[in-house]
């Protein structure tokens, strides 16, 4: 699997389970009588810290029962590390997914080259297509980003739909 150039820089900055647990506890403690809460895994690439993501999801489920809460969880990923095991776990645990794809191939590869400058689009599209095909009705959408390099972003939206992603969002 190809890694983006910045991934080694951020490995030492990954959140520990202790910090994640305290964040969940804070959310529950400060949600008052509110039954429904939300927790989002995003920033950097959450799947680089997969073990902590799993621990946190398991902890949230235990705390939901203990405190009578319903916590909707979502995870934003670039899809590079999204494999069958992760898709199954996230789907089985009802985690909403925001799948990030920076437009069509030439746009995406320009914005997100691999560690050696190679394109990542083909591998990511393959991973996202597998994910979407195996969501079993669980929520997801593919989020594209438009920049000064793809002001014709409608072309990117059409490309995403043509790749089998009917749930698409575009963001600046």
What are these regions (language model features)?
Residues 11:
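Short helix/strand-bridging catalytic loops that position acidic/His residues to coordinate divalent metals
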Residues 17-20, 24-40, 49-172:
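Radical SAM/AdoMet-radical enzyme domain recognition
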Residues 43-44:
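Short acidic donor-binding/metal-coordinating loop in glycosyltransferase active sites
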Residues 1-8:
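Single conserved hydrophobic/aromatic residue that forms the stacking wall/gate
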